A protein has these predicted regions:
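Non-catalytic positions within long, well-ordered alpha-helices that form the structural scaffold/packing
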Residues: 104-107, 204, 223
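Metabolite-binding pocket within alpha/beta catalytic cores that recognizes anionic/polar moieties
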Residues: 25-158
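Zn-dependent metallopeptidase/amidohydrolase metal-coordination segment
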Residues: 213-254
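His/Asp/Glu-rich mid-to-C-terminal helical/loop segments that flank catalytic regions of hydrolases
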Residues: 241-293
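Generic non-transmembrane alpha-helical segments
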Residues: 164, 168-179, 270-278
Length: 317
């Protein structure tokens, strides 16, 4: 990846966006994006050196929160809190397009996402991790493409995550004492309500292994941005296909779920630290993900205005 110098001032434009907060920085070498929740972000912040927050303007509005850029060891990372400060954004309100566009604008070519899920399988136990390899998208209120209104773009999604980065995560998990499932199908629902029992049983019948609300359209937009994307699912509980113990009160169930989520977050942090400390290649310009738009634009290029081409030029880098 080439070195990009970004001057964060209100006067200096960078691909029609502005960065603010902090002094000038140079994005040296590889910058790995991480998208996750507040717990993971707080833990990473304690380990980052030379950390700065960056506000990034995009054609799709502001991302969920300022992006925290810094270093862990020899790796530079850019962390984005998906739900915003204080977990204020419901899944349907997350500005997924702005989040992915902002990451790409900063020079991120690889993103590792993380997020809480419910388990649809007895063998996937709360507190464990899953490196997701497939999705079933049930969302219906979210913008799932950057190209609305001026171009038709059909990206391949048969293999919806980067197998190369996913394998790096799987290999790293073998080095540490963290139970990590090497594959799993994630059913992404709109929310914010949880499933009915009938829906949960249906999702199991479809072949789903996990149920969550945040992976889509994040993975689709990452593919449109030509970003290598992998996802670590943090299992917080069993979904309602599996009845809870009749004598358990709601408060104790919630405490149990939060404890499971904290355990999974700690495991995810350990896995990410292992990956960042390793020598495996996280960013590769030769990866097929980096060429996902090569044959995807079906609209006659002459019919796309210069302004629209300039607006989304970042996606083609």
């Amino acid at each position: 990846m080439c070195v990009k110098k970004i001057v964060p001032s209100e006067q200096r434009d960078y691909h029609k966006g502005r960065l603010t907060h902090g002094s000038s920085i140079t994005m040296e070498g590889e910058l790995v994006g991480i998208i996750g929740g507040t717990g993971l972000g707080d833990a990473l912040a304690q380990r980052l050196t030379d950390a700065k927050l960056h506000d990034v303007d995009t054609p799709f509005g502001k991302p969920s929160a300022p992006i925290m850029v810094g270093a862990i060891g020899q790796k530079r990372i850019a962390f984005l809190n998906r739900h915003g400060k204080g977990h204020k954004l419901a899944p349907s309100e997350v500005p997924f397009a702005a989040n992915i566009f902002a990451m790409k604008k900063l020079g991120v070519h690889t993103v590792i996402g993380s997020g809480a899920v419910g388990s649809l399988r007895e063998e996937i136990v709360p507190g464990e991790l899953v490196v997701v390899d497939q999705f079933i998208d049930k969302t219906f209120r979210r913008i799932s493409t950057f190209f609305t209104g001026f171009a038709v773009v059909h990206c391949e999604m048969a293999e919806p995550v980067c197998s190369r980065v996913s394998q790096v995560l799987i290999d790293a998990a073998k080095e540490i004492d963290v139970m990590t499932h090497p594959d799993g199908t994630y059913v992404c629902m709109e929310g914010p309500q949880f499933s009915s029992r009938a829906e949960s049983l249906m999702h199991r019948g479809w072949g789903g292994d996990l149920i969550g609300m945040t992976a889509m359209p994040e993975a689709k937009l990452a593919r449109e941005a030509q970003i290598c994307y992998a996802l670590i699912a943090l299992v917080s509980d069993y979904d309602c296909w599996r009845p809870h113990h009749a004598k358990k009160v709601k408060q104790s169930l919630l405490q149990e779920i939060m404890a499971n989520l904290q355990a999974a977050t700690n495991n995810c942090l350990k896995l990410i630290e292992t990956v960042l400390a390793g020598e495996a290649e996280l960013v590769s310009e030769d990866c097929p993900c980096r060429k996902s738009l090569e044959l995807a634009v079906w609209t006659d290029k002459s019919q796309i205005s210069a302004a629209d081409k300039k607006k989304l030029a970042v996606l083609f880098e």
